[in-house]
Curated annotation (Swiss-Prot):
The keyword Transferase appears for this protein: no
Any single Gene Ontology cellular-component annotation: cytoplasm
Top-rank EC class of the record's enzyme: hydrolase
InterPro entries: Actin, Actin/actin-like_CS, Actin_CS, ATPase_NBD
Residues of the signal peptide: none
EC number in record: 3.6.4.-
Gene label: ACT1
Family, as annotated: Belongs to the actin family.
Locations listed in the record: Cytoplasm, Cytoskeleton
Reaction(s) catalysed by this chain's protein: ATP + H2O = ADP + phosphate + H(+)
UniProt protein name: Actin-1
């Protein structure tokens, strides 16, 4: 595909938006999925104040703005703000005219039908896209790992899903959703650090804790054993320098926060951990394909980036599964962006080019066309 007609691939996550061109091996733009509006009108006189800010700009001006996340738990809940994010993606980040490029968007598993239609409508009517496609995030992650069958554990900032996929098709009856993800772990780490006497209260400080989480946290293979080790020596302690120069020490918080993925009770949630949820998802599938699923458990999303998570997952899932089963956890190093990468691969396949939903088809059939063309 020549560069001028390269398709655009946009993966809209609850926390970050990833965007770029089909055929590239990584997204060109990665920015927070936030829209900020000034708290007080006319405070910044002469600043040429805008009525809204998106992404990094909203993040850097957050002191004077009210921030909103238009995507909650993976699902778009505020379409006006979502439109602003897409506008920002096309015109400010990628600097392209959307009417000149096919657009591939991603959606959460179990996204309501009305939502897919709304997405389709906005792309064709507001942005005049020549062609459009919407793909399920977890399916793209599986493609990115070079598979068409497997179960994807996709955990981002706002939501976690287990999605069994057979021969390229997600099995909706067996998809499970867990409302526990990166944002909750950051909150939990804030709580743990409070107990140590380090208060983090503002949204700015919350970003610092997210950074601590990403740099220092890991998943213990044996939680109780790790707690004992941490209590008996300072071997597991690490220090972190705050922006103001203060240095804080963090010990068992390093593995206590991510442990909530396996023990949601830590957060007061009556949910199954990610290992049990994966097992339950597999159990809802046909007996004949379970072996293929156990042997292809693919991790995807930023919240699966903790060191030690694959080994722990291997251990827990093996303990739950029938003894004859071979469990294999696949943790690609680029899994933070594997949804986007899968989209880039799909949209640049020559065999995919006749699967796009065109503007003409949309004009003839309306938004419902998306259910017939994209599945």
């Amino acid at each position: 595909m020549e560069d001028e007609v390269a398709a655009l691939v946009i993966d809209n996550g609850s926390g970050m938006c990833k965007a770029g061109f089909a055929g590239d091996d990584a997204p060109r733009a990665v920015f927070p999925s936030i829209v900020g509006r000034p708290r007080h009108q006319g405070v910044m006189v002469g600043m040429g104040q805008k009525d809204s800010y998106v992404g990094d700009e909203a993040q850097s001006k957050r002191g004077i703005l009210t921030l909103k996340y238009p995507i909650e738990h993976g699902i778009v809940t505020n379409w006006d703000d979502m439109e602003k994010i897409w506008h920002h993606t096309f015109y400010n980040e990628l600097r392209v005219a959307p009417e000149e490029h096919p657009v591939l968007l991603t959606e959460a598993p179990l996204n309501p039908k009305a939502n897919r239609e709304k997405m389709t409508q906005i792309m064709f009517e507001t942005f005049n896209a020549p062609a459009f496609y919407v793909a399920i995030q977890a399916v793209l992650s599986l493609y990115a790992s070079g598979r068409t069958t497997g179960i994807v554990l996709d955990s981002g900032d706002g939501v976690t899903h287990t999605v069994p996929i057979y021969e390229g098709f997600a099995l909706p009856h067996a998809i499970l959703r867990l409302d526990l993800a990166g944002r909750d772990l950051t909150d939990f780490l804030i709580k743990n650090l409070m107990e140590r006497g380090y208060p983090f209260t503002t949204t700015a400080e919350r970003e610092i804790v997210r950074d601590i989480k990403e740099k220092l946290c890991y998943v213990a293979l044996d939680f109780e054993q790790e707690l004992q080790t941490a209590a008996q020596s300072s071997a597991l302690e690490k220090s972190y320098e705050l922006p103001d120069g203060q240095v804080i020490t963090i010990g068992n918080e390093r593995f206590r926060a991510p442990e909530a993925l396996f023990q949601p009770a830590f957060l007061g949630l009556e949910a199954a951990g990610i290992h049990e949820t994966t097992y339950n998802s597999i159990f809802k599938c046909d007996l004949d394909i379970r072996r293929d699923l156990y042997g292809n458990v693919v991790l995807s999303g930023g919240t699966t980036m903790f060191p030690g998570i694959a080994d722990r997952m291997q251990k827990e899932l093996t303990a739950l599964s029938p003894s004859s089963m071979k469990v294999k956890i696949v943790a690609p190093p680029e899994r933070k962006y594997s949804v986007w990468i899968g989209g880039s691969i799909l949209a640049s396949l020559s065999t995919f080019q006749n699967l796009w939903c065109s503007k003409q088809e949309y004009d003839e059939s309306g938004p419902g066309i998306v259910h017939r063309k994209c599945f």
